[in-house]
Amino acid sequence: MVLAQLGGSISRALAQMSNATVIDEKVLGECLNEISRALLQSDVQFKMVRDMQTNIRKIVNLETLAAGTNKRRIIQQAVFTELCNMLDPGKPAFTTKKGKPSVVMFVGLQGSGKTTTCTKYAYYHQRKGFKPSLVCADTFRAGAFDQLKQNATKAKIPFYGSYMESDPVKIAVEGLERFRKENSDLIIIDTSGRHKQEAALFEEMRQVAEATKPDLVIFVMDGSIGQAAFDQAQAFKQSASVGAVIITKLDGHAKGGGALSAVAATKSPVIFIGTGEHIDEFEIFDVKPFVSRLLGMGDLSGLMDKIQDVMPADQQPELLAKLAEGTFTLRLLYEQFQNLLKMGPIGQVFSMLPGFSSELMPKGHEKEGQAKIKRYMTIMDSMTAAELDSTNPKLMTESRIIRIARGSGRQIRDVTDMLEEYKRLAKMWSKMKGLKMPKNGKMSDLSQNLNIQQMTKALPPQVLKQMGGMGGLQALMKQMGGKDMSKMLGGMGLGGD
């Protein structure tokens, strides 16, 4: 996950506070100082950090709290709220709608990853059912059209550009006319970047915008610049009518928190963040779920969106029926592994689970987790239909395990490890037996049939402990809003929207 170091530091500060025998001014002060230190190291402006401390102390007045009040929970809620306020510009961004043609213009400085981000943005919307297209109006940088052409071809997205024409306005207009005729409902225009903010860049952007009349202008910014993002975002907002911001390169830089908070201070909504070079390393940015993940509380609403993307609607009733029966077979595990691999980077997916520490899977270790899943799937490929569909653990005799190991080319230990993992997941799945199913068979309507006891029962003990027990889960539901939390639990097959 992005900002793993920052999230880990804040989570540790809250955990140390929670472990204290008595919560007094000294313990609160130490907790807030640790959180402030972590934010300053992430290049968040000093004034923002100081204001956050002041606001938390106003909310958490230990002297006026009634006896028996859960001080730990109030402090955690205050930290969550203030972090959200720090990253929330308080202004919604324009949203594209399927079937209704939208023109989106990308602007930014050279080297910010603008051209790559155009393709990621198009690919994201393509997976959501849009018909995107790309227009390269960047005639300043040599190789810009080649790069866009290569990226678009790989993602199977229609594109337009010219090696001969030097007028970006003419290219933009021609591309727009062409894709409107082809009924594209999302036309993305990539414009020229420069090494610095200069009059020529802003004038060219103004001309392209005047000719194409975009519904949205997106400013792409390098997240590694930290709090310097404030001046950059402000300048582009004033000169190019920027309606939204995408921050790139948040996967490997410690200053990402500074960039996010600085952009929010300009009242410009951040709509996506880039978390790597690959086309699927691109996340929608929503403040509450982002802070929830940062604090190790997960983002199961985001996970539910990913599940909905990869699981056809006609498969959902069958999955829900198995959930109600408490039936979890190896075949079902195999199918869920297939879905998991389609969801994108595994570290990004796991960071959406409550209790997952982003430091447990640094970026370099994601491939190991992915390889393990593929290894388990190879083992299951060597099983018979009876073995895959059985719920009887005694069926897996020693002779069967030896045969499966030989057939898959794996060690016996690998097979037993996979079976242990299956048993653990099956036990968790069985706890949802008897859950009342929605009449329409949709996972999205399951949340209204859940109660707090079922949620508590289904979550693994270590995850529940990380969330602060039943009280912590209730507090999290309150923080996220009941509906949002129900959506979040949907991502685990426990509910959703």
Swiss-Prot record:
Highest taxon of source: Eukaryota
GO molecular function annotations of the record: 7S RNA binding; ATP hydrolysis activity; endoplasmic reticulum signal peptide binding; GTP binding; GTPase activity
Region annotated M-domain, chain positions: 296-497
GO biological process: SRP-dependent cotranslational protein targeting to membrane, translocation
CDD domains: SRP54_G (cd17875)
Quaternary state and interactors: Component of a signal recognition particle (SRP) complex that consists of a 7SL RNA molecule of 300 nucleotides and six protein subunits: SRP72, SRP68, SRP54, SRP19, SRP14 and SRP9.
Domain notes: The NG domain, also named G domain, is a special guanosine triphosphatase (GTPase) domain, which binds GTP and forms a guanosine 5'-triphosphate (GTP)-dependent complex with a homologous NG domain in the SRP receptor subunit SRPRA. The two NG domains undergo cooperative rearrangements upon their assembly, which culminate in the reciprocal activation of the GTPase activity of one another. SRP receptor compaction upon binding with cargo-loaded SRP and GTPase rearrangement drive SRP-mediated cotranslational protein translocation into the ER. The M domain binds the 7SL RNA in presence of SRP19 and binds the signal sequence of presecretory proteins.
Name recorded for this polypeptide: Signal recognition particle subunit SRP54 1
Gene label: SRP54-1
